Amino acid sequence: MRAAFDFDGRHALVTGAARGIGLAIARELHAGGARVALADLDGDAAAAAAATLGVHALGLTLDVRRVDHFEAARDRLVAAWGRIDIVVNNAGWAPLTPVAAITAAEFDDVVAVNMRSVFSSCQVFGPVLQAQGHGRMVNVTSLAGQNGGTVAAPHYAAAKAGAIMLTKYFAQLLAPHGVTVNAIAPGPTATAKGRLSPEQVSAIEARVPIGRFAEAEEMAAAVALLASDRGGFFVGATLDLNGGLYVR
């Protein structure tokens, strides 16, 4: 795999990296020369995914709802690598629960996974990157956080909107210290097709001006741009990756 950007000598953490968009991001960074930690709630799957990348990749068990897991990951990676250069907050959860059936517990869990985790990660890793005088943080949000969602449930859309605002906040806080914080907002992506009926897939494709779902690798390419040296002037940006479904 030929990488679009050079990450030689960089050290990256990607959450939700056992599969899907997260794994594609990890592959892109690794192909560019980065050492990559693939973190996931399913630690065994993260380790298996890391093994497919070969050397300079490792798997971690990380529950993004728990700040102590972020702290443990920070301590382990700093001890192993001496530094962390790139943090990609990709982990997410998008249940398709009908509004009337959403419980308070599910609502809180969705917010914890999709929004509070971004805060926890920035709170834990921000000072590390700041002390180094250089770093990149990229948050994977969603089109649902921009337009309220259609297929997505309301708690997911609200949490992703919050993640976009946290991106803006931490971008302004950390930019003076050489650390950029940005986001991508994926629209319909092929990794989600398995959760949809053929009729839903066709209906979504008909609404997307480009006429198709995105590939996970297209999301990874955008993250790589934001994480690269060439992406150093992006600060607090959210890149719209939706095939024209939402234009602003």
Which residues are covered by each model-predicted region?
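Residue(s) in the substrate-gating loop at a strand-loop-helix junction
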Residues: 142
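A conserved structural motif in NAD(P)-dependent oxidoreductases
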Residues: 208-219, 230
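Active-site helix of classical SDR
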Residues: 122, 159, 167
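Substrate-binding pocket helix/loop in short-chain dehydrogenase/reductase
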Residues: 98-99, 103-111, 204
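Alpha-helical segment proximal to the catalytic Tyr-Lys
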Residues: 127, 172-173, 232
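Canonical Rossmann dinucleotide-binding motif of NAD(H)/NADP(H)-dependent dehydrogenases/reductases
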Residues: 7-36
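Short, small/polar-rich loop/turn modules that mediate ligand/substrate recognition or access, typified
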Residues: 175, 180, 234-236, 242
